Amino acid sequence: MSPSVRDARNDLASLQQQAAAEAEDIRRWWSQPRWAGTKRVYTAEDIVKRRGTFPVVEYPSSVMADKLVETLARHSRNGTVSQTFGVLDPVQMTQMVKYLDTIYVSGWQCSATASTSNEPGPDLADYPMDTVPNKVEHLFMAQLFHDRKQREARLSCTTQRELDQLGPEIDYLRPIVADADTGHGGLTAVFKLTKMFIERGAAGIHMEDQSSSNKKCGHMAGRCVIPVQEHISRLVTVRMCADVMHSNLVLVARTDSEAATLLSSNIDARDHYYIVGASNPEVTVPLIEVLDAAQQAGASGDRLAQLEEDWCKKAKLRLFHEAFADQVNASPSIKDKAGVIAKFNSQIGPQTGASIREMRKLGRELLGQDVYFDWDLPRAREGLYRYKGGTQCAIMRARAFAPYADLVWFESNFPDFQQAKEFAQGVREKFPNKWMAYNLSPSFNWPKAMPPKEQENYIQRLGEIGYVWQFITLAGLHTNALAIDNFSREFSRFGMRAYAQGIQQREMDEGVDVLKHQKWAGAEYVDSILKLAQGGVSSTASMGKGVTEEQFGSSNGAKL
């Protein structure tokens, strides 16, 4: 084909010119204040190459992401909090949006109640990867529907009195933040999962630093984290996918390292300070060999557990700096033991990122001999390294993740304000304006953890130190269980009185719109569509004469 007849799609100069213009558009997008704290390891040109030729469109989820950012920014300015909880279904969603400004979709709840395989289970992220995106779509479609239904009703009013009788407008379009777990696999899985969330209505997602093959609920034992850089690659992939799709998706980086006991690989020097090793030179046989030999000899599970406990005790499992201190204290030739230990700790600490090579070198210089420390001997059967996390470990990881995410979150085992404060100060020492999230977990025993007055103020106290988004992951599940348990018990005892007085009358008294469930489900709205399609009349309208919902007028003391 000659240059004179070659069209722009097949002319390299034209193609490059078009790509350059698209890249400039992306750079303008990235220059917005929204991205002031976001680090990207790729260029606008890299993103252009990975987009197709279809015109760039704005996903509805991106509009909701902008709304989420505005919501969190307002709370950050005011020292207030966006507080929410894990929602199970559209019924819960339509009630919570009257009072709360964001919505949370929990992977735990989806695993137990909404897996796309219909096989329930605990929160191990072993459900199909479209499970949580499907729940997001379920809720987002309901949000859009109830928003349309409400607008039709309000625009059908002919007087201010009629509009006033409907009450204040409800914002059904509250931004949804969803649980992306560990990404459900490698980086290509992370990319595809992110794409699903964007397509199905999520304003934001959170992703944690656990191993995808060993994922546990954030309040279970045996949590295994991945190297720092490996999780950064996940976060980069999420943002890259969003950039390819021209989405302003909000990303929350979660770390489970505070209570982690295992690490998948020792490749990242930032993790070396927290890896546990054997410090007793008399122990030379790896734990796994001891256990394998015992198992082959017919040892029971209890016997194997006892052997492991005995081996670990004899091996004197320590972090490197602890092993160094032990060996300094045991050395008769070192007089100023405290001074030597202090000198080591002044150069090697939780936030220094020193490698094992650097720690060994300094230890040798100060001790006069090699520090005995072997982190391979106690490795777990799966090949995992033993890890001793903690708050400082969570701070280290949150700092590493912060440039790649909009919010950071550390999963904790207790609702400990001082620990939350330590984490916030540690993060904001390096990233002063970083937003933080906090899990008000139902796995905590709240009545035991603090008195009622402190429970009432806990959210606000956290908000004042930077935790702008807080959520009860499983409140939807627990309120559902409590309500059904109570009603079932009363129904078995009192028959219809339990429903009439305990449910229906309370709906009337409290103005719960689901009282008129046909109207709530959109029967009037759909009737209006049928009438519009048939020239203004429909003999099959569902809310016409004879519908039993006429029984629920403005009488009976109902607020509706």
From Swiss-Prot:
GO terms of molecular function: isocitrate lyase activity; metal ion binding; methylisocitrate lyase activity
Binding site for Mg(2+): 179
Catalytic class of the enzyme: lyase
Biological or metabolic pathway of the protein: Carbohydrate metabolism; glyoxylate cycle; (S)-malate from isocitrate: step 1/2
Chief localization: other
Subcellular location: Glyoxysome
Short motif Microbody targeting signal, span: 558-560
Family: Belongs to the isocitrate lyase/PEP mutase superfamily. Isocitrate lyase family.
Function: Catalyzes the formation of succinate and glyoxylate from isocitrate, a key step of the glyoxylate cycle, which operates as an anaplerotic route for replenishing the tricarboxylic acid cycle. Required for growth on ethanol or acetate, but dispensable when fermentable carbon sources are available. Also acts on 2-methylisocitrate.
Entry protein name: Isocitrate lyase
Organism of provenance: Eremothecium gossypii (strain ATCC 10895 / CBS 109.51 / FGSC 9923 / NRRL Y-1056) (Yeast)
Organism lineage string: Eukaryota, Fungi, Dikarya, Ascomycota, Saccharomycotina
Gene for this chain: ICL1
